[in-house]
């Protein structure tokens, strides 16, 4: 299993990581069996999924708490652990983010808030260091929280050994350059799938130039690319899928027609459509890290199957042609 770099940090991991947003539960994901979630994280590490990603906002600390419980039973050296900072509900700030389960959440990328976030996360995660620290959402007005202050705080945490690599999520090319100007940026985490490819044109050229890695979240496009969604599948009122452009009738039909063309490949590689999509997604961008969510051991096993797929060059070209045809 080939490892790939996380920017210039010196950290290397397999391409597939485990996302733990769903483990946070709450109104977005519904109730969780935390004991199953702990087993899911243990299973991930056993299957060679080393990168475990979480965030304080996931379930308003609940995801971090569950990941921390799992870490009590896992060799820390076998895990690349990432979390995030910059979303605040301990106190009000000038930048409103949104309301989550009745709690008003703000953005705060001040040095003070970042340091507090990290200390709190270290405690919940039962560790003395984070392998990657992401800023979760950037502030629209850097006059309130200067980017230089944000990056300097993260560089200080790195010098102290509390974090090993610096990441940023939900960025622009200019913001990537800003991080690199004031310090170091190792990785960005962005939405990317076979249907959502803005990263390739808007961010990838800058990342290549500056040696910044990319980690993709939502690679299965909220389940649309698993092969389990049909044109007749409906979602309850309030579901984000109802507003996702990929789920609208015309785009959904394109996606399902594309997946239908790959039935012979699932037989050839003895895999599910979801596993095939994950494997292809990892090849779309050289060195791409792919983050797949799971909250049960079975879901982890399903995702982990993608690690064993070695696509033939001709098959990868054929599939990419199909993807390009609907892009």
Protein language model features and the residues they cover:
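N-terminal binding-site loop/beta-alpha segment at the start of enzyme catalytic domains
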Residues: 1-80
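Beta/alpha (TIM)-barrel catalytic core signal, keyed to glycine-rich beta->alpha loops juxtaposed to Asp/Glu
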Residues: 3, 138-327
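Acidic (Asp/Glu)-rich catalytic clusters
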Residues: 8, 70-76, 123-126, 179-183
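N-terminal small/glycine-rich loop or linker at the start of catalytic domains
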Residues: 9-28, 82-104, 134
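Structural preference for beta-strand elements that scaffold enzyme active sites
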Residues: 13-17, 50-51, 78-82, 129-132, ...
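Active-site mouth loops of central-metabolism enzymes
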Residues: 22-34, 99-115, 141-143
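Short, acidic/polar
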Residues: 31-44, 110-124, 172-178
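Active-site groove signature of glycoside hydrolases
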Residues: 122-141
């Amino acid at each position: 299993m080939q490892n790939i770099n996380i920017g210039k940090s010196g950290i290397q991991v397999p391409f597939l990581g485990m996302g733990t947003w769903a483990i946070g539960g709450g109104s977005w994901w519904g109730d969780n069996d935390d004991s199953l979630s702990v087993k899911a994280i243990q299973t991930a590490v056993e299957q060679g999924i080393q990168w475990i990603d979480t965030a304080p906002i996931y379930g308003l600390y609940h995801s971090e708490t569950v990941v921390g419980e799992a870490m009590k039973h896992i060799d820390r050296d076998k895990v690349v652990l990432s979390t995030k900072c910059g979303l605040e509900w301990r106190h009000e700030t000038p930048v409103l983010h949104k309301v989550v389960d009745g709690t008003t959440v703000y953005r705060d990328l001040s040095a003070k808030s970042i340091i507090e976030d990290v200390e709190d996360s270290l405690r919940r995660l039962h560790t003395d260091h984070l392998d990657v620290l992401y800023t979760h959402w950037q502030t629209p007005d850097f006059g309130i929280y200067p980017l230089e202050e944000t990056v300097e705080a993260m560089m200080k945490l790195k010098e102290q050994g509390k974090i090993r690599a610096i990441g940023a999520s939900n960025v622009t090319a200019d913001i990537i350059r800003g991080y690199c100007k004031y310090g170091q940026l190792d990785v960005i985490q962005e939405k990317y799938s076979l249907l959502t490819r803005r990263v390739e044109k808007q961010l990838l050229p800058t990342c290549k130039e500056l040696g910044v890695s990319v980690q993709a979240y939502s690679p299965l496009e909220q389940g649309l690319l698993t092969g389990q969604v049909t044109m007749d599948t409906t979602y309850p009122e309030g579901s984000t899928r109802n507003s996702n452009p990929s789920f609208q009738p015309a785009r959904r039909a394109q996606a399902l027609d594309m997946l239908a063309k790959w039935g012979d490949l699932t037989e050839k590689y003895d895999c599910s459509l979801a596993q095939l999509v994950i494997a292809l997604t990892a090849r779309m961008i050289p060195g791409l890290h792919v983050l797949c969510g799971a909250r049960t051991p079975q879901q982890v096993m399903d995702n982990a199957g993608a690690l064993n797929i070695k696509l033939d060059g001709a098959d990868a070209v054929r599939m990419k042609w199909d993807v390009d045809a609907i892009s």
